[in-house]
């Protein structure tokens, strides 16, 4: 790099910082256009940071989405006297990624412990089969009571083993929409099955 390029980049840095600070203050006022501009200018850095921590593209996409949702909800909590908008955002992203790693590790540890200490007692296979058949019929009946889009989302996720992001890709729908359909569908299934 030449010295003039470095000087030009250094001169642009305060402008970018000031621009992001201004955009984040507008986001705090629920300005959707400012949020879109803030997202466009920062998404690559946020996703890159999260991917370096998580090392999984699917979790990274989901965590990035969570970070920007948190930005939208908590932009008013940004204090420019403490640091720049970019450092606030990257700190938020790093914390969220580390939380995700800890959560996954805790879940893995719980599963390992449970698997190590749980021993299946002898059972009556005929009675178990009858109960399973009855439960399958109840679940199938309750699935039929869902809307077509809810049923399709649940079948893709639970019967075909797809992640929410893969379901969104398959159905060409927004991930937030898929999550909403899944939540509503599961709620309806619980109600139908009499599960709290």
UniProtKB/Swiss-Prot annotation:
UniProt motif Polymerase core binding: location: 62-65
Keyword Transcription assigned: yes
Gene3D superfamilies referenced in this protein's UniProt entry, alphabetically: 1.10.1740.10, Winged helix-like DNA-binding domain superfamily/Winged helix DNA-binding domain
GO molecular function, one term: sigma factor activity
InterPro entries associated with the record: RNA_pol_sigma-70-like (IPR039425), RNA_pol_sigma-70_dom (IPR014284), RNA_pol_sigma70_r2 (IPR007627), RNA_pol_sigma70_r4 (IPR007630), RNA_pol_sigma_r2 (IPR013325), RNA_pol_sigma_r3/r4-like (IPR013324), WH-like_DNA-bd_sf (IPR036388)
Residues annotated as signal peptide: none
Span list, region Sigma-70 factor domain-4: 142-191
Chain positions covered by the region annotation Sigma-70 factor domain-2: 39-105
Coiled coil: none
Keyword field contains Transcription: yes
Any Pfam family matching the protein: Sigma70_r2
Annotated keywords: DNA-binding, Sigma factor, Transcription, Transcription regulation
Matches recorded under CDD domains: Sigma70_r4
Record feature DNA-binding region, as residue ranges: 164-183
Quaternary structure and interacting proteins, as annotated: Interacts transiently with the RNA polymerase catalytic core formed by RpoA, RpoB, RpoC and RpoZ (2 alpha, 1 beta, 1 beta' and 1 omega subunit) to form the RNA polymerase holoenzyme that can initiate transcription. Interacts (via sigma-70 factor domain 4) with anti-sigma-K factor RskA.
Description of its domains: The sigma-70 factor domain-2 mediates sequence-specific interaction with the -10 element in promoter DNA, and plays an important role in melting the double-stranded DNA and the formation of the transcription bubble. The sigma-70 factor domain-2 mediates interaction with the RNA polymerase subunits RpoB and RpoC. The sigma-70 factor domain-4 contains a helix-turn-helix (H-T-H) motif that mediates interaction with the -35 element in promoter DNA. The domain also mediates interaction with the RNA polymerase subunit RpoA. Interactions between sigma-70 factor domain-4 and anti-sigma factors prevents interaction of sigma factors with the RNA polymerase catalytic core.
Protein family per UniProt: Belongs to the sigma-70 factor family. ECF subfamily.
Function noted in UniProt: Sigma factors are initiation factors that promote the attachment of RNA polymerase to specific initiation sites and are then released. Extracytoplasmic function (ECF) sigma factors are held in an inactive form by an anti-sigma factor until released by regulated intramembrane proteolysis.
Protein name: ECF RNA polymerase sigma factor SigK
């Amino acid at each position: 790099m030449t010295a003039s390029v470095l000087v030009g980049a250094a001169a642009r840095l305060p402008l970018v910082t000031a621009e992001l600070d201004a955009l984040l203050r507008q986001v705090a006022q629920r300005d959707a256009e400012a949020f879109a501009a803030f997202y466009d200018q920062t998404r690559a850095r946020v996703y890159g940071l999260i991917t370096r921590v998580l090392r999984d593209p699917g979790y990274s996409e989901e965590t990035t989405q969570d970070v920007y949702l948190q930005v939208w909800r908590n932009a008013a909590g940004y204090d420019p006297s403490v640091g720049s908008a970019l450092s606030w955002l990257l700190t938020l992203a790093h914390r969220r990624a580390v939380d995700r790693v800890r959560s996954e590790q805790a879940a893995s540890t719980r599963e390992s412990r449970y698997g190590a200490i749980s021993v299946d007692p002898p059972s009556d296979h005929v009675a178990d089969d009858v109960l399973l058949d009855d439960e399958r019929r109840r679940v199938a009946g309750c699935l039929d009571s869902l809307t077509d889009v809810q049923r399709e989302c649940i079948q893709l996720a639970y019967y075909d083993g797809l992640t929410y992001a893969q379901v969104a890709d398959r159905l060409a729908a927004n991930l937030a929409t898929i999550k909403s359909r899944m939540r509503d569908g599961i709620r309806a299934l619980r109600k139908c099955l009499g599960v709290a």
